[in-house]
Amino acid sequence: MEIHQITDFNAPELDVYARLTENQLVNRADPENALFVAESPLVIGRALDAGCAPVSFLMEQKHIEGKGAALLARCPDVPVYAAELDVLTQLTGFHLTRGMLCAMRRPKLRDPAVLLQDASRVAVLENVMNLSLIHI
């Protein structure tokens, strides 16, 4: 496991957690490289179970051996960026209530024809700015 102690807030590998907007993460111009950030151990675990590929973890130092250990064991080749909670709060601009984040590759969108072939109901949502909030 590759653990990096955060010493430089401007390190480009931390951009996904500190400086990129949701629209930049979605990256419509290059969907193969689109990302999302999973925001708790439960969400990270579910995303891994669904086949999402992790890019990196941002984690409170104490969780490397604690509640993050099982997740990290599942992803031994994924870099971990760690610091104390106050440093992470300064970096992200908010308090990490569960002590960890994980940048993950956004899954490819499924073919609408396949999704609709057995559907008995269809909902059309307009002007949605953040797809992760509707849990599709």
Over which residues does each language-model region extend?
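Boundary-proximal intrinsically disordered activation/regulatory segments immediately upstream
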Residues: 1-61
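Short secondary-structure boundary/capping elements
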Residues: 12, 39, 83, 129-132
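Short, glycine-rich nucleotide/cofactor-binding loops
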Residues: 31-37, 122-132
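Short beta->alpha connector loops
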Residues: 41-42, 63-64, 107, 129-130
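Short beta-strand/turn micro-motifs composed of small residues
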Residues: 59, 104, 125
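S-adenosyl-L-methionine/SAH cofactor-binding core of RNA-modifying enzymes
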Residues: 62-119
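Conserved small/polar residues in nucleotide/adenosyl-binding loops
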Residues: 134-136
